[in-house]
Amino acid sequence: MPIVFWTGKLSLPMKLMINTNNILAWLTGNARDAIAMKQRIRQGYEGVFSDHVTGYDELGTEFQMKAAIAQLEELDLQGKEVLDVGCGTGIISLLALKKGALKVICGDISEYMLKLAREKAANQGYGSDLIEFRNIDAESLPFGDASFDVVITGMTLGLLPDQAKAVEEIARVLRPGGQAAVGAHGPEHYWEACDASFRAINKRYVLGYRLEFWPRTEKEVRLLLEQAGLVDVRTRRLTWQNSFENGGNAYDFFAAISSSWWYAKFPREKIAEDSKKTRNYFERKRITQITDDVILAYGRKPRDLA
């Protein structure tokens, strides 16, 4: 079920504004249209609303690699068949192969992200015998029950309308005894950039549409795994500050990583103008620190009783 009230950190005025807007979205039905929500996210990561996403790897790999390395360091991937849900440009998938995975399925809702992942895999010498690319919906995985030894999703959960369903799908496709590793956006994840963007953008075009980003607490993520039937669940939270030379650089990073999907309802001719205004706001307010808040959760699928 889609979430209505903002679950992360924001300044009080912005939290009140977002919650009021999301109530309106619920009343009009927009907040319950999960298909449209996922479509906006997919289009954002395919560059439909802005070309910022073309800088995804150049501007974001250094920061995203830190979370990916931390997520995989607890996993034994040697000889395992692995599914990477919401693989983006393949950062986790390629790390999994380096850690000895037998084969990785790199799955994402965006064909543009998959294109970049394919190119990176080819450049690193990984063929189709080791890595396969699939367009997938995290809430309805196109795989049979008990298909993988390990299922990983890195920092995708917060973009999904039905997070519980996504975790249930992860558990379903795991083999008995298999490991799940879920990376989730914590409450403070990118909050400075979110807050500044909400203040700066033209509100008339986003009025009545649910925001497509939903951070979670460590306790909430743990509960999602437990409710999906996973056992031996453990979590840890990592936070750090990403520093940028100036506010413009901070905005460029945020717009690329988040894909600027909030421009979905803007007239196309208004997007560049509003993006420039928002970037100027970041510079004027000296937004040069952006928090990474990462919840890492692990669980095991129980073995069949016999």
Language-model features, listed with the residues they occupy:
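Conserved class I S-adenosyl-L-methionine
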Residues: 5-77, 91-95, 125, 181-203
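Class I SAM-dependent methyltransferase SAM/SAH-binding core
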Residues: 83-85, 89-140
